[in-house]
């Protein structure tokens, strides 16, 4: 039986810059290490999930694909204020119960206040 998500890997142009975005927005924990083949790996921890930031050239079209984190209304409002100060694009949705924002490589992240029903 599966236990939990180990990590989510995202290909990004600049792992350090993307990690800094999450550090600035959420005080995310950043870990860098070398793998067995000597490649530098960058991870950030968001909402209990490790995000692996894989450095490679990337151009993404915006689709409906996204990673969503549950958050309180206060966290959403604080994130909006930070995104505005940073000049980052974001979209409010569902009567302000959800917030979508984009990293530097157009990956979409959602913060929402709604629970997914158990059944």
Task: Put a short name on every predicted segment.
Residues 1-17, 64-67, 71, 117-119:
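N-terminal beta-strand motif that seeds the catalytic metal site of vicinal oxygen chelate
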Residues 17, 74-79:
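Short, conserved charged micro-motifs
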Residues 7-9, 43, 50, 66-68, ...:
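Short aromatic/hydrophobic contact patches that present stacked aromatics
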Residues 2, 9-51:
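Core segments of cupin and vicinal oxygen chelate
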Residues 31, 80-81, 85-119:
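Vicinal oxygen chelate
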């Amino acid at each position: 039986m599966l236990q939990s998500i180990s990590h989510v890997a995202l290909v990004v142009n600049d792992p350090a810059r993307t990690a800094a975005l999450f550090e600035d927005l959420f005080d995310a924990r950043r870990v860098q290490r070398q793998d067995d083949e000597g490649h530098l790996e960058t991870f950030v921890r968001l909402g209990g999930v490790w995000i692996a930031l894989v450095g490679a050239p990337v151009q993404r079209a915006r689709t409906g694909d996204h990673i969503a984190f549950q958050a309180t209304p206060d966290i959403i409002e604080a994130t909006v204020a930070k995104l505005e100060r940073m000049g980052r694009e974001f979209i409010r949705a569902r009567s302000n119960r959800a917030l979508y924002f984009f990293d530097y490589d157009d990956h979409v992240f959602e913060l929402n206040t709604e629970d997914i029903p158990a059944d």
